[in-house]
Amino acid sequence: MGDTMVEPVPAKLSDPTLVLRGNGGSPLCVITEGVGEAQMVIDPDVAEKACQDVLDKVKLIRGSSAESLDKIDGSDTGDGGSLANGDAGPRHSESCGPPVSASRITEEEESLIDINSVKSARRRQKNNSAKQSWLLRLFECKLFDVSMAISYLYNSKEPGVQAYIGNRLFCFRYEDVDFYLPQLLNMYIHMDEDVGDAIKPYVVHRCRQSINFSLQCAWLLGAYSSDMHISTQRHSRGTKLRKLILSDELKPAHKKREIPPLSLAPDTGLSPSKRTHQRSKSDATVSISLSSNLKRTSSNPKVENDDEPVRLAPEREFIKSLMAIGKRLATLPTKEQKTQRLISELSLLNHKLPARVWLPTAGFDHHVVRVPHTQAVVLNSKDKAPYLIYVEVLECENFETSLVPVRIPENRIRSTRSVENLPECGITHEQRASSFTTVPNYDNDDEAWSVDDIGELQVELPELHTNSCDNISQFSVDSITSQESKDPVFIAAGDIRRRLSEQLAHTPTTFRRDPEDPSAVALKEPWQEKVRRIREGSPYGHFPNWRLLSVIVKCGDDLRQELLAYQVLKQLQSIWESERVPLWIRPYKILVISADSGMIEPVVNAVSIHQVKKQSQLSLLDYFLQEHGSCTTEAFLTAQRNFVQSCAGYCLVCYLLQVKDRHNGNILLDAEGHIIHIDFGFILSSSPRNLGFETSAFKLTSEFVDVMGGLNGDMFNYYKMLMLQGLIAARKHMDRVVQIVEIMQQGSQLPCFHGSSTIRNLKERFHMNMTEEQLQVLVEQMVDGSMRSITTKLYDGFQYLTNGIM
């Protein structure tokens, strides 16, 4: 308190008083001197200040701001509650009233507190109502998307807001919500009950509608609950919901399902015994019995299936079979033994197909009819045995209700062939289409061709499938056309030479078969050629709805980090597309089955840079020249641009997510020149053996720069420009990326979340406080540092010495 001065105040002569005033001129106290005694009287201004101090403390506790306090003080004088300033009422020293006692001041303080508390509560209620009104307008506007809904569901602490968001989920498209399914289920498992109660109705509703959604929920709930302690996990909400889903209680509202009549061709004359084929146990639960088929007549076109099938059992058994194969392969010592065992296991699996099973990674409804077992390959892995399979499916309208195709048995190939042994040569298109329900007689081994031995020949002799047969057939068509044409066609010699040279440049090279790396041959073969070849050898290939899918089965690996990386890549891809930045990345689908198993969507028409260098013994630039022609051709320039756009995109991904373990076995090169990074097992806070050896922002080798045209080339400058544009676009939408990672950190024990600074470091890598000029300098520094990084070279050398990765 500042200095004071004594100032006389008008009073009775017999009762002089002294008033102490502070620097502001306000009275501090009044001292009355009498005969033989000194009486202390509290001035109203002092009481006002004391009340104000109490109010400040109360409001501070209740979270009121100083601004609202000032507003209340200035507006409440008319109520007789408090005195805003010294001029609001007469001072006690100037009044004729008696002295104010201390007890009365205490009552006034309490009254002031009560009155102001009520007014403050009313004002807070008005403010909250205004905020809720604006929030409701936001929730109901067209710009409110799933990303914003997930953000408010995670950050809001108001049960009413959480419940509203839970209901709002029903308004979004299924595919938009499905993208955030890991976040929703992780919040359901690890956050409070209000969030779980808001999410559960939507999940239950979707599970009643879709078997595929039910299984994905069950798998994710099991995987994300595994981080909990066993005693807690057993009684957790996630475990209870998973049991509810797998108990098959969440069935559709209708109890019985009507089955459409089975159309029979009148001229087939097949007896019931001919039409009854061996089916799997899993399909037995969903297939239609022969007797029920015979009951469908013209007078009774529809017959209800009395026994409601077990909805989830067939698909679960199918997935378990694939996972069990991978576990058994891991016990074998050599790659050749693993490959032989894989082929025999898949051959046995084919005896249970077709069935009401499907690949969850596909984007359309279908039934699996066959697995060409000789085309399966074991992928490169030091300790485990991931394998790649191709799956023949028949597309259908609804895999839950559409009829399962009948089985067409495979038969052994003959060493000699004749016209008599080709029964399908005379089958018309209509007859082939009708064979969906009427199976031709394949009892005679001489009358059928098996894809098994054909596939073995193709694996042993891959050169036979990449010869010039297509060129010969095209040449024959061109010759016939030219012979039939009577008018001469003049073509410049230069155009002919250019077309021939570019055609040769587009002709893909082949890889030789390597017993230590059998996947190289399979992955190098063009996808369309593979589809054509497998379809020609398949007994189901003549169906118009035949499709070929592929999937990688992994056992012993936790794919939850892969799923997280996939979500971030998809979000970045969407951001760059919306901001019109021509960066290219290829996110591939991840299916988490459990905490140590899952499926991965393969990238077709792509091989690893390690396989390229090992098979061709060429530098990356020389391989580009071999595959796409000289550096002046249109094919090479297109491939070079694709390389630059994809390299810039993945460099930003590797920087933002801190992707490690970037050896050449984890970087693919596709037929169009793009690079694709795979294996995101080490991201954010984790690194191989937790050594943190790779210190560069991303991998940018001198070979990559050579493909771009060198340090002084236009394409290298284009690469740096794309890096800058991509980083600027990404930081504009930082929240959309960060929330994906932040929500998954809840309750997680994944290595990528070790340490308390994971999210903070991720946000810092977006450099929100930098100008665009500063970002440009940062990009230049990161590019220069990555090119000169000694740790990148040492890590590549370490991988070559330990694992033979070039």
Curated annotation (Swiss-Prot):
Ranges of biased composition (kind: Polar residues): 283-302
Gene3D superfamilies: Phosphatidylinositol 3-/4-kinase, catalytic domain, Phosphatidylinositol 3-kinase Catalytic Subunit, Chain A, domain 4
Ranges of residues in domain PI3K/PI4K catalytic: 525-791
Family annotation (Pfam families): PI3_PI4_kinase, PI4KB-PIK1_PIK
Region (Catalytic loop) location: 658-666
A biological process term (GO) from this entry: phosphatidylinositol phosphate biosynthetic process
Domain of life: Eukaryota
Reaction(s) this enzyme catalyzes, per UniProt: a 1,2-diacyl-sn-glycero-3-phospho-(1D-myo-inositol) + ATP = a 1,2-diacyl-sn-glycero-3-phospho-(1D-myo-inositol 4-phosphate) + ADP + H(+)
Top class in the EC scheme: transferase
Membrane topology: Peripheral membrane protein
Localization per record: Endomembrane system; Mitochondrion outer membrane; Rough endoplasmic reticulum membrane
Function: Phosphorylates phosphatidylinositol (PI) in the first committed step in the production of the second messenger inositol-1,4,5,-trisphosphate (PIP). May play an important role in the inner ear development.
Protein name: Phosphatidylinositol 4-kinase beta
Species for this entry: Xenopus tropicalis
Originating gene: pi4kb
